[in-house]
């Protein structure tokens, strides 16, 4: 298959999902949180990381749903496992503060480290900040987890 044809096929497959995501975003921006939630939830059920992160954000701030840090963490985790950088950053923040998940600096450092490796300067700063609350053994454990994730992603 030529590169042009492969790109066209990828666009044809991604097109409807992208349109649905944009429809949900438009609904969200207009304050129609119910429609946004329904659209993103349908996409998230299909494994769309952007939609999973969007649902997490709705639960994080309580936009159209009850604020629920636990549900936010669940949705962020699903997106983060797919490599979504913002989800990784936000999941790391939840672990560092213990909101919705037990406080766990190793997990926080790992998720922030993965986001930092994707170019997030904020995640890199936050990782450095929480490292002051960690032992050297915890930092080494978190670094090992980061390497394991990066190896799996290759």
Q: Positions of the model-derived regions?
A:
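TPR/TPR-like alpha-solenoid signature
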Residues: 21, 53, 74, 89, ...
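Sec-dependent signal peptide recognition
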Residues: 2-10
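Hydrophobic face of amphipathic alpha-helices that form TPR/SEL1-like repeat modules
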Residues: 20-27, 39-43, 54-61, 90-97, ...
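Short helix-capping/linker turns of helical repeat alpha-solenoids
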Residues: 28-32, 40, 45-48, 61-63, ...
């Amino acid at each position: 298959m030529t590169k042009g044809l492969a790109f066209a096929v990828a666009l044809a497959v991604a097109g409807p999902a992208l349109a649905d995501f944009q429809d949900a975003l438009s609904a969200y921006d207009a304050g129609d949180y119910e429609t946004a939630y329904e659209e993103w939830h349908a996409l998230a059920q299909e494994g769309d990381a952007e939609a999973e992160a969007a649902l997490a954000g709705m639960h994080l701030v309580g936009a159209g749903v009850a604020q629920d840090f636990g549900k936010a963490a669940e949705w962020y985790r699903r997106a983060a496992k797919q490599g979504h950088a913002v989800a990784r950053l936000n999941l790391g923040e939840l672990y560092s503060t213990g909101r919705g998940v037990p406080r766990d600096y190793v997990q926080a450092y790992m998720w922030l480290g993965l986001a930092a490796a994707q170019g997030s300067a904020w995640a890199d700063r936050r990782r450095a900040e929480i490292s002051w609350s960690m032992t050297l053994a915890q930092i080494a454990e978190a670094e090992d987890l980061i390497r394991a994730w990066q190896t799996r992603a290759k």
